[in-house]
């Protein structure tokens, strides 16, 4: 029996864009959502975020995490990537007036593609691998580092990056 349940709106693109918006920025959200997207995209618009480059994948659900926390604060997380796995359908060239990009946790192929597209377009970007870091091998991570102008990660992720690449930060 699960006595309490609540929906939280999250996702890397939405969270980053909302935070930048609160700081006075004009972020452009590029993401993929599923057939169940309406409450999420409505909320983004209500918060002042543009959704012009949020692509709906009609045969998928929006990525979702279900987190169960016991009375001792231990957590089990089940994650379904859903539409996020189609992030490679979005292309940087479809967006205008981009001066800085962020490659944050997303579908594996999409992250690789978007880093390459930012670089080819001459748009500097932040590589923020977050929980997506384990998806990549040494060569892929070295490529991200080479292409990116900036990197953002916590101490745990930085240590994992050093271990996977054999490089120090």
Which functions belong to the PLM regions below?
Residues 9, 33, 107:
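Charged, low-complexity surface patches
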Residues 29-48:
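Short, electropositive alpha-helical surface patch
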Residues 32-33, 63-68:
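Catalytic-core segment of enzymes that process non-peptidic bonds
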Residues 12, 36, 110:
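Conserved alpha-helical elements of sugar-nucleotide-dependent glycosyltransferases
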Residues 3-5, 29, 50, 65, ...:
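Glycine-rich, flexible loop/turn motifs
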Residues 42-56, 60, 68-169:
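Ribokinase/PfkB-type carbohydrate-kinase core domain
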Residues 23, 60-62:
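Short, basic and Ser/Thr-rich N-terminal targeting/leader segments
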Residues 1-30, 39, 86:
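Glycine-rich phosphate/adenosyl-contacting loop at the front of the ribokinase-like
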